[in-house]
Design a protein with these regions (language model features):
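Hydrophobic alpha-helical segments typical of transmembrane helices
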Residues: 1, 70, 108, 124-125
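Short helix-to-coil transition segments within interhelical loops
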Residues: 6-10
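Alpha-helical transmembrane segments and their short interhelical loops
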Residues: 12, 17-85, 135-144, 149-156
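Helix-loop junctions at the membrane-solvent interface of multi-pass transporters
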Residues: 39-41, 99, 103, 129
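Transmembrane helix segments
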Residues: 76-115, 119
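Extracellular/periplasmic helix-loop-helix junctions in multi-pass membrane proteins
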Residues: 104-111, 130-141
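Transmembrane alpha-helical segments of integral membrane proteins
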Residues: 118-131
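Short cytosolic juxtamembrane segments of multi-pass membrane proteins
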Residues: 159-168
Length: 168
């Protein structure tokens, strides 16, 4: 993708934006396909609250986008950090709350765990799909604020590292 930077109108942020949209589209398609299959197998019903489902999805995308921009900015600045990105990404999968519910945690651990911004979007999606049948814990304003900080910090890191990009 760096070859596109030969063109004057294309900036690094355009490439990152396209990659983020591609990831979001792929994740959305995967979620939709799995949900349709489970719906056809009568394992899930229609979502109870579409607005909460979509809000959680967008909130999760917002926080993830910001975190990805931070990782990208750090990888652009420090070559050794580039090797850690996949390790960090794979570590975040179980921490995100996809494989377990926040309600399963003891209250004192739940409070600490909810400082991680990713589970808030996942819990909102869970609440939108299952409704009152599943207890959920989330604070959308907290995750929105952390996502905003992530995005601003990520954009600053990328803009500051722009001179470190070498087009071969």
């Amino acid at each position: 993708n760096l070859g596109l930077l030969y063109h004057r109108q294309i900036a690094p942020l355009h490439i990152f934006g396209a990659r983020i949209l591609l990831e979001l589209g792929g994740a959305t398609a995967a979620f939709f396909i799995v949900y349709v299959v489970l719906f056809c197998l009568k394992q899930v019903g229609l979502p109870h609250n579409y607005l909460l489902l979509y809000s959680g999805w967008l909130l999760l995308a917002w926080v993830s986008c910001g975190f990805a921009l931070i990782l990208t900015g750090l990888a652009m600045r420090y070559e050794s950090f580039e090797r850690l990105v996949s390790l960090i990404s794979y570590t975040l999968i179980p921490i995100s709350g996809v494989f377990f519910m926040v309600s399963w945690l003891p209250p004192h651990l739940r409070e600490i765990y909810l400082y991680v911004p990713f589970p808030h979007g996942v819990e909102m999606i869970r609440a939108g799909v299952f409704g009152e049948f599943v207890p959920t814990y989330y604070h959308p304003l907290y995750a929105l604020a952390v996502g905003s900080i992530f995005n601003i910090l990520g954009l600053l890191l990328i803009s500051g590292a722009r001179d470190r990009i070498s087009v071969e």
